[in-house]
Amino acid sequence: MPQHRTTDVVVIGGGQAGLAAGYHLRRAGLDFVILDADTAPGGAWQHTWDSLHLFSPAAYSSLPGRLMPPQPGETYPDAAHVVAYLTDYEQRYDLPVHRPVRVSGVHRDGERLRVETTSGTWRARAVISATGTWSRPFIPAIPGRTGFQGTQLHTVEYARPSDFAGRKVIVVGGGNSAAQIAADLAYESDLTWVTLREPRYLADDIDGRALFDHATARRKALDEGRTDTSGVASLGDIVAVPPVRTARDTGLLKPQPMFTRLTATGVEWPDGTTADADTIIWCTGFRPALSHLAPLGLRGPRGRIPTAGTRALAEPRLHLLGYGDWTGPASATLIGVGRPARDAARAIAELLR
């Protein structure tokens, strides 16, 4: 028989944002559960490519209440270290995570919100959606894409360069993921890196610490009614982590302009130039994973739900956490999600009094 349960708050998503929410809900004295679709702790970090490293030291990659310990021999921790940290965090605070549980929909149900899942129904006084973006990869509608006879992957499906040894690979995208995957492939594959505009590297001495400090300063300026035009964000898009820096400086990363269409065997540029490809890897970003909130009818422009901070404007019982700057500055990062998680927990505690 399906189960029907009641709680103060349902948190949807057991990655870094969901755990940060759980930490602050516990401190606020609220009854809550965290519903996670994955079978194990670690969120999206357990699904990344093998060589992925953070671009901040461990101390600048921590959730509230517990510093991430350094990884021996590494300035910037790898994804496996992050998974171990999140697993420990969840256990240390005895967070009530239920998994694997997939949420199919959130509905208004009188004074509560009804959360329908694969393991039954929860009725909650408030909901925090923290499902992130990793489960909703975006690939642009490029002419000819369905007719390409090679292999097409998104960032989420890339694992290691040895899978593409000796093959002609085109990497599409101008952000950190594209640069890191291109650098990963540059030594074993016949690589072409394609970007919409010329890649902009941040200075080599800038890492995630500076980016977080800038995001914090930007939020303070906005809160005070000022326009923040300073900081590192205007200087580049790509953090020059050591593998990217090495590949760039040795001439292995030579970006090409964006092509206009795919052919059966590769790609074609506006001047008629073509290039063959065995594989195209789309490092073209993600969209918020919000389909479970569709029954509430809240979606606005660009697929987002209009918010004030983390609170949905049209449904004060719903908070959105960790989807990007529109749900809090740097809220999609380990260190940045703590403050909006705290704000969401406080707002919910006030609402439920």
Predicted ranges, named:
Residues 2-38, 42-44, 77-353:
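Flavin (primarily FAD) cofactor-binding/catalytic cores of flavoenzymes
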Residues 40-67:
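Redox-cofactor-proximal catalytic regions of oxidoreductases
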Residues 69-73:
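A short acidic, helix-capping loop that chelates divalent metal ions and anchors anionic groups
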